Regions:
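Conserved Walker A/P-loop ATP-binding site and its immediately adjacent core
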Residues: 123-129
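Conserved RecA-like ASCE P-loop NTPase motor core of nucleic-acid helicases/translocases
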Residues: 118-122
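Peripheral, non-AAA+ core regions of ATP-driven protein-machinery
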Residues: 2-11, 15-80, 85-93, 98-109, ...
Length: 453
């Protein structure tokens, strides 16, 4: 009996048994395509035929792990967990034009200069175009081998013959496997190409970096299984109106996840920013209502960013809630806690919240800084310019201490801040030179800082 066909959404990877004009999972139109599986074998069990026994090893061993290779770009090495691990597969995603190809071309040049045999394969540009960009970035003398190809079989044959230590594939969506009957960029093609390249990396000890396109929602396009296949998933983020870019690790088998590296886009490519807090606060002027500095932690790195809030009477029947750089659902929670526990209503008021510089913050410890910015804007009262705020707010109005308090305070002190407002409790800290004002609940915070509540 013939196997019934399956259909996949090219946007989200959802699999269905029949074709439809609109994907039921993500709602996208005209993205359903027939899925041609990778395997051509029969859809039966393995049966009684015996396979070869695999070689087993002990978990404990005296063999030293292969050393990491650093490229000299400190921010990239930090995100990778201390350097490039041999035989690792890395997926890098980001919006179009954000600088993925520029970053990886610079990384390829640095790795090649450090002694790694490096091959850069582009499926989107001709070799001459990649060479032009390398000349503009001052990388023309780097010993990097270039190729412009999309046929996966030819690429794997070339890698087998050249035996590089690092291969960069730009991008995985342009790769074409001739054993899969689907168009390049489809779910089947992306899954097959990622599987073949990842298997090659493990089998031959080659580090492979894959560039991935992203969807409108900011997720890497193609099936989610690709992110499970690779060892590391990096997102390259940034706002087009700002000069800096953030490389964020969302998965890393060989280092900390949520680590970030900060770069600045210049005429000569991407330059690393060793002190991102100073960059994010560089344009901060005199203290103004609604402006609060949050001492946050991104991965293992303390980062200071500015929250800006604006509260104004709403001319509409339903007040607006606009958030940039933070979670809108968490803003609604903070507004509800302020009204229920402190008696401060925001009904009939438009609320706008922004993280300055285009930075994205997801840490719960930003709750208290957001509440302070909202109250400062509503009461038209500025917080002192030398004060940082951090702490998590519970639904009861109690404040919970944040982790790594000492690292946050040290970073704030380094940038000239002398006061901090945080939740009471947690481990005692010994940072001198900065006064720490501990609050137990949101009511006491409102009463002491803003004289209300």
């Amino acid at each position: 009996m013939a196997k019934s066909p399956s259909f996949s959404c090219t946007a989200c990877g959802n699999v269905t048994s029949k074709w439809a004009g609109r994907c039921e999972a993500c709602g996208e139109w005209n993205t359903i395509q027939q899925d041609a599986g990778i395997s051509k074998g029969p859809a039966k069990s393995l049966g009684g035929k015996r396979g070869a026994a695999i070689h087993l090893t002990d978990l404990s061993t005296e063999e030293t792990p292969p050393p990491r290779t650093t490229c000299g770009i400190a921010e990239l090495d930090r995100v990778l967990g201390g350097g490039l691990v041999p035989a690792s597969a890395i997926l890098v995603g980001g919006d179009p034009g954000i600088g993925k190809s520029t970053l990886l071309l610079q990384a390829a040049a640095q790795f090649a200069r450090s002694g790694l045999k490096t091959i850069y394969v582009s499926g989107e540009e001709a070799s001459a175009q990649v060479r032009m960009r390398a000349q503009r970035l001052g990388l023309a003398d780097a010993p990097v081998k270039l190729a412009a190809e999309t046929n996966l079989r030819d690429i794997l044959t070339t890698l087998e013959a050249e035996k590089p230590q690092l291969a960069i594939i730009d991008s995985i969506q342009t790769m074409w496997a001739d054993n899969v009957e689907a168009a390049p960029g489809s779910v089947s093609q992306v899954r097959s190409a990622a599987h073949e390249l990842t298997s090659f990396a493990k089998r031959r000890g080659v580090s492979i970096i894959l560039v991935g396109h992203v969807t409108k929602e900011g997720q890497i396009a193609g099936p989610r299984v690709v992110e499970h296949m690779v060892d590391t998933v990096l997102y390259f983020e940034g706002e087009r109106g700002h000069q800096f870019r953030v490389l964020r690790a969302v998965k890393n088998r060989f280092g900390p996840a949520d680590e970030i590296g900060v770069f600045e886009m210049t005429g000569r490519g991407l330059s690393e920013v060793l002190n991102p807090s100073a960059l994010f606060l560089s344009e901060r002027g005199e203290p103004s209502p609604g402006s609060v500095v949050f001492a946050g932690i991104e991965g293992t790195r303390p980062v200071l960013v500015e929250f800006q809030a604006l509260v104004a009477p709403s001319p509409h029947a339903q007040a607006r809630r606009t958030v940039v750089g933070w979670d809108g659902g968490r803003l609604a929670m903070i507004l509800a806690v302020l009204e229920a526990r402190c008696g401060i209503p925001f009904a009939g008021l438009d609320v706008y919240l922004n993280v300055a510089g285009g930075m994205k913050v997801s840490e719960p410890a930003a709750d208290l800084a957001v509440a302070a910015a909202l109250l400062s804007a509503r009461e038209d009262a500025s917080l002192p310019a030398d004060t940082v705020v951090f702490g998590e707010i519970s639904l009861s109005g109690a404040l919970r201490p944040a982790s790594q308090t000492e690292n946050r305070l040290k970073e704030a002190q380094k940038l000239g801040f002398t006061n901090a407002i945080a939740a009471a409790g947690g481990k005692p800290v010994g940072t001198s030179g900065i006064a720490l004002n501990k609050m137990r609940d949101l009511t006491s915070f409102v009463g002491e800082i803003f004289g209300a509540g």
